[in-house]
Amino acid sequence: MVFDMHKLQKLSVLALKLNSKIVSAESCTAGLLSASLTEIPGSSAFFEQGYITYSNNSKTSVLGVENKTLKKYGAVSEQVAKQMAKGALKRSNSTIAISITGIAGPGGSDYKPEGLVCFAVTKINGKTRTETMEYGPIGRSKVRS
């Protein structure tokens, strides 16, 4: 798989230790995070489900991302990543949600270039942490991984 399996293994150990279940909400990665998590033996003990919400319409209809947030900040923003994570958590029996939205390329703009990826992690009754990474024009496959 494409994600750093060592880091995902550490995440799985932590989730098991906390008796937590993980849900993912993915846009630009189109399910690669979910696929990578389920490569870990015993993943059914910590991974519940994943949502692939590639279009803006699916972000609103499936995860409850607000149209006004999409219009104001764009699909690739920490604000949308946060709403994706919170929406996934609300619609699942999980206690931890991870979301990813970005511009895999080609394309982008000066304001939101190719390789821009926004992440959010939230837990039930907890804070949401967001982060934006700029990987640059390294190609779709590398941005998505």
Task: Give residue spans per PLM region.
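Short alpha-helical segments enriched in small residues
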Residues: 1-145
